[in-house]
């Protein structure tokens, strides 16, 4: 099979460079007893640590200190007697003068940009103020057979960045910083919860019955059991089983899977944190969420004000937005959000506050409002009740306008099959979703612990599935059985890690914060 891409001038030039590098590797192998990839260099220091310790010292101070450092990393540039070496922490220069360090410079004939080397020597500072290691030892540790992208252009092709993330990480410091930030955010969440006596647990990825969210699952087959199974869409039901069992505070940070579309905010495989607390309600969780995000922002970013930007096709910033996590978050009911944000939407004249606040007695008016504002119906709409229509109206007219940190509360029970009904108004539940910049980041509620009510809601979900809604939940008899043993008053929440990282790192698409996002196979 012929790869048409290999016939382009760029591909032909690359193939020539690869061939030249293979020749160099063969020469290296022929001149040494090993295989050309030695593993005997002891790296003792990182570039960033050296820069932090000695960056402010003068040239004269370093010459007096005469400190020796051993570093290793990838060669990113060759400039006369200097090599620019990049390790996991940053960059530093190595120096070898051809008339003094002849033996070392002789080895540079086989050196290419992208090779991995180890160097050792005394630290100095150049006249321009740059630190460098004056080499008395040099080892080629790994020969890079493929050339890195052109240094002046870097790696700008988005497809290549996502498909070959390893190249992106080598070339782009911003990408490396994004994933370092992601690691710190996850660690911050874990530390925040464990310091408050939450226990981290692991629950199954493979499930016989998918549950815990309304979403279409991925299917697989267990050969030994001859059993169809599902990749989990959420860990919720198993985590609440643990609360039934006596673990009052639990959390899990792990992957979930939903067989749905891909967008700038959705990836079929994604990471979330779910946590559950006995003897708490959804108000407690809103308070916890505020404190958690504020704490993590301060620890990771050094500020509670988050800057996000909108860029044009040239990468130039055309708009800045600032989200203040230091102020109390807005709390707004779903109906109030519709009335506040929907007033400028098409069909706004149809929005009837009285009907929205008494939907069960104004179902026809609710449906008329939904049609007026542009809600699209589908094959499952025939089983929608007023609560589902109100939620669709909210998503159409208000959700994308929730810019500053906002909790939306009072979700109808119809769209909240696992949430506890409100004591004063049984049409709504004690549930919230959290939004920043028009993105949903979290979903939490006081848990439904009435086994009979839960069974009825599962049955309604089954009816919706039978009507064509492939995202509706299955009936989970074992979960009902667990509730019948008694779930204490409990509140639980899920936060999308990927979207949270997008917010904290000013990333416009979810693919920028997932190391290896799902992509369509490349055309042959």
Swiss-Prot record:
Top enzyme category: ligase
Residues involved in Mg(2+) 2 binding: 440
UniProt key word ATP-binding: yes
Cofactor: record remark: Binds 3 Mg(2+) ions per subunit.
GO cellular component assignments: cytosol
Gene Ontology molecular functions: ATP binding; lysine-tRNA ligase activity; magnesium ion binding; tRNA binding
EC number per UniProt: 6.1.1.6
One protein family per Pfam: tRNA_anti-codon
Record has Iron as a keyword: no
Cofactor: Mg(2+)
Compartments reported by the entry: Cytoplasm
Any single biological process term in GO: lysyl-tRNA aminoacylation
UniProt keywords, alphabetically: Aminoacyl-tRNA synthetase, ATP-binding, Cytoplasm, Ligase, Magnesium, Metal-binding, Nucleotide-binding, Protein biosynthesis
Binding site for Mg(2+) 1: 433, 440
Subunit organization: Homodimer.
Similarity comment text for this entry: Belongs to the class-II aminoacyl-tRNA synthetase family.
Cross-referenced PANTHER family: LYSINE--TRNA LIGASE, CHLOROPLASTIC_MITOCHONDRIAL, LYSYL-TRNA SYNTHETASE
Protein name per the record: Lysine--tRNA ligase
Natural source organism: Colwellia psychrerythraea (strain 34H / ATCC BAA-681) (Vibrio psychroerythus)
